[in-house]
A protein has these predicted regions:
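Short, well-ordered secondary-structure "scaffold" segments embedded in the functional core
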Residues: 1-264
């Protein structure tokens, strides 16, 4: 697991995402980022000064906010598991070494995030608001089609490792080590072409405990709660350039997607 720094690695990751981008307009994307809530047993006052920082009110349990960046092939290129469960994605990302690594990406390369992340030329996020003009809505839709790779990567990770289906009960200092090991093993399994055991192949007891994933999308129980209300505004050159490219080729959100998301 290594963050891309060499021209060869950057070009390899960017080519894989561009091939999956409609009209190949998302040139330069080398990853997609998001947060994963991993449940843990409550830490003790001997482990941390503020135990409640590890409690997520939205999840109703203790845990860790794990930040990660995935490539187009469901491999993780970077991860951080040092933030308490109550931490939002913005804070967890900015307090990790990942944010420094992303900030050093060469001009023209970037990762994708959702509205919880800070917009920059190296980290593109959706345009804020509802009822957007077609060109902004198109950008948001096509960004989400690529950003979903990190959610699918999390989904594969969680479905594969049964130890994540219940709160981690290893020692407090051992939890980050265990989580990192699972991420490395995930990449190894992807490289080896190993497929997680299907639900139909499992014993009934195990099948009932396994988190149910559809198209490898992460179940809600593992998602970090997202902020509600107004989103941050602003614009950066890279995002505007892609939005204009989509507009120039007449690429809009597919009608079937609009109809599926229209309230009836």
């Amino acid at each position: 697991m290594s963050f891309p720094t060499t021209p060869e690695h950057l070009e390899e990751l960017a080519a894989a995402f561009q091939a999956k981008s409609t009209g190949e307009v998302f040139a330069g994307c080398v990853g997609a980022t998001d947060g994963l809530h991993i449940r843990t047993a409550a830490p003790s006052i001997h482990d941390v000064l503020n135990v409640l920082r590890y409690f997520s009110g939205s999840k109703g349990c203790y845990g860790l906010n794990v930040q990660a960046i995935a490539d187009a092939k469901f491999r993780f290129v970077c991860m951080s598991c040092c933030s308490p469960g109550s931490t939002n994605d913005w804070t967890a990302f900015m307090s990790s070494k990942m944010s420094d690594a992303v900030a050093t990406l060469p001009h023209g390369y970037y990762i994708l995030g959702d509205a919880a992340y800070p917009l920059s030329d190296q980290l593109l996020t959706p345009y804020p608001g509802k009822g957007l003009d077609a060109e902004y809505d198109s950008f948001n839709f096509h960004l989400s089609q690529l950003r979903v790779k990190v959610e699918q990567s999390f989904g594969i990770l969680v479905a594969r490792w049964g130890i994540l289906w219940r709160p981690l009960r290893v020692g407090f200092d051992e939890r980050p080590k265990l989580i990192r090991a699972l991420f490395h093993l995930h990449n190894y399994c992807i490289d080896e072409g190993s497929t997680p055991i299907g639900r139909g192949e499992e014993k009934e007891k195990t099948r009932k405990r396994r988190p149910h994933t559809t198209n490898d999308i992460l179940p809600d129980d593992f998602r970090v709660a997202k902020p509600t209300g107004a989103r941050r505004s602003g614009e950066v050159e890279m995002r505007r350039g892609i939005m204009l490219s989509l507009q120039r080729v007449g690429q809009k959100r597919p009608r079937r997607n609009i109809e599926r998301n229209t309230p009836r």
